[in-house]
Structures are given as C-alpha cells and as structure tokens.
Amino acid sequence: MATKLDRRTFTKALGAAGAAAGLGGIPVALAQARPRVVIVGGGIGGATVANYLRKAAPKVDITIIEPQARVTTCAGSNLYLGGIRTVEDLTHDFTHLRNRGVQVLGDSATAIDTSRKSVKLASGETIAYDKLVVAPGIDFKTGAIAGYDEAASELMPHAWRGGRQLTLLKRQIEDMEDGGTVILAAPSGHYRCPPAPYERACMIAHHLKRHKPRSKILLIDAKPQFAKEALFKAAFVTHYKDMIEFHQSKTADELAVVKVDAKARTLTTRSGQALKGAVVSVVPQQKAGAIAVAAGLVDGDWCPVDPATFASTRAKDVHVLGDSAMADPMPKSGFAANSQAKVVADAIAADLAKAPKYPPRLRSTCWSLLARADTVKMGAAYGVKDGRLVELNSFASPLQEPVMARAKNTSEYLTWYANMMSDSFGKSG
C-alpha cells in the first residue's frame, strides 16, 4: 500500500480553519470550512476508504451514504450457506467509524451531478463534495433472461448480495424435502467473486450431506473455463461424488440461462435444455452499480479508472473502486476492494494536501472452502506498468496438497475474514 501522509503535514496544508474544526458529529451543512469527501456505498470498499482516509487526513469531513444500518457482506456468504458461519458473523455496522468522526447517512444516493459536484439523496437532500468516492457494488443485467426480474429473484434468489437474498436462499434449502434438487446457475462475463459459484455448490452440498443426504445439486455453468477449475472439479468428486452434478458449457454461453419461470421453478438454457428444481438460484450477468451507470461513469458495463489512483476517467474529482471498477486483471472481490480502497484514501489525502502520490501496491487473495477442513487459495500482487494495471506475481494451491496444508488454509480463511472486517469497518487500529 502507498505510504501514508504525515498527519501534521496534512493538517498544516489544510490551513488554520480546517485544523481548528472538531472531528465528531458535524452536521453536513456546517462542514463547508474544510474539504468534504463523500462516499457512496458503505460496503467493504467504501468503509475502508473512510477508515483509512480518517487516519491519513484527520481534518477532512467524511460522509458515507449507505441506506443499510448494518451491512451483511457477500464475502463469506457461502460459509453461511454451508452452516459454518451465521449471518450475524457476516453483518457489520458503522459504530467504530462514527466514533472516529465519520458521518454515516442512512440514505440512498439517487443522482450524482459531477459538474456541480453534488449528490442527491432519496430524502431530497443534496450533499456537496470536494472529492467523491463511488463504491456501489454490482447491479444485474436481468434483461438477458426472459422472465427474470426483481419479483422472480424473490422465488429464485441469486443471493449475490448479502442480507435478505442470502437468508432467503438458506431458508429455501432448509425447507426443501430430502431428495430435492438444488439448481445453481453460474453466469458468464465479469462478475463478483469468480470462484464463488463453485464454492457455493460445495458449501450447499456440505450442508445437504448432513441434513438431506438424498438431495442433489445441479450446477450449470455458462463458461467453458473458470478460476480454480481443476481444484473444484477434484473436490466435486472427492467430497460430493453422488451429490454435485456439473454441467459446463463447451463454448461461451452454451448453457447460459435465457428463460425462467420463477413460479414453476424452471429454467431454459441457450442450448435448449429445460431444468426444474425444488430450489433454483440463478445468478445473472452483472454490471456496475446503478448509481454509477446513472452518473455516466461507465464504459459498457463497468467504470474505467486510472489504475494508479482509481480516479474515474469520466469525471474529475471522482474515484470508483471495488466491484464497479474496471480493474482487470484484479478480480472483483472483498479483498480487492479493501486493497483498492487504501490506494484511493492515499490518493485523495495527497490531492487535498497537494502532496506527492506514491505508486500503488495492490493485492488480492481468494480462499475457497471445499469441505470443513479443506480450503484452497489463489492470489496475486499488482502494480502499474505503462499506464495499465498488471499482475506482478501470483500463487495458487496445487492440485495435490497435504491435508495439513489445506487445514491451515481453512484457518487462514477464517482469520482473514475477521481481520479484514476489523480493517474495513474501523474495529482496530
């Protein structure tokens, strides 16, 4: 991560008026005397920016706009479906950030005017900013699937956001009779957490083996290849041979879902295959969060950014990070969002203090739980070369790995999640 600015230097650069202001509980209307940073989205990325910007720039007014008082992360959600973690383990609030002087508005951003540098809220209020961070996560491209809309997702939950969708899928699985079929449909294209559909199949199978052993999982994949492919395929045979039935496209989108009947719990693939399940979870193709699209920050489905700072290339004084950002070759993941957020916090602090920026150092690691003590991982470090984000080095679990190494990976996974939540939501340091 880039070097942090010295607090004394930053305060001096802001001037006496900013230095004299207090940190806590400042109403939005009274914070005009010092720079204001507004963060749209209070998930892992947005919360991390607030936490690290507060450390680097204690005299800046920081406001998070997030409608949920408590955020349930998508990271770790498969462990909940597998019965290894509770939904409370995945749910976090903003108490610690508030205690550090970060203002959190329980509201939704409905429009961004990048020329006037303001954000309009659902409540009707308009918030001005000097710097804006957009971290709204993902939205879904539902138009590609006939019959699939928000109402259909209540019957066929994608559970690709935390919270209600996640608990809905869990409840459907628990209510299913032993012997029922769970259908999981994985999308093509860029989407949140590339290995997650396959970990999800493993974790649901882990639950079913204990509680509904006559049931099965039908995993349909629109892609001809995917992350950790050999590792997951081995796990399907080793741990869930008679439970997970995997259907993989031979060509792109061959088995993409093109039509659903949510009430009948049926889906149809592009190849003409018609399938029916007791529980059906269709994960649609994805795009940047709706507010980023409405603000004109996208090029196609995602938001182009300067890889050195994650500054939007579409609007001045705006940064986009996390799932909505076009940050290849980094995956869209909680780890990546946390890493990118620290780069954004440093870049904003440097801009406001008129101080030099440092080359970013980014990392991402992804663990996947195959069974209770069997976890695999992959990851990489990233930097900027010739104006592009590039992978500097990488690692991945080997196909043949000692049992003790896999058990150690499991411990790492659980420890990482706890530590990252503390790091993101200001519970430590």
Language model feature labels by segment:
Residues 31-103, 188-230, 429:
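Beta1-alpha1 glycine-rich phosphate/pyrophosphate-binding loop at the start
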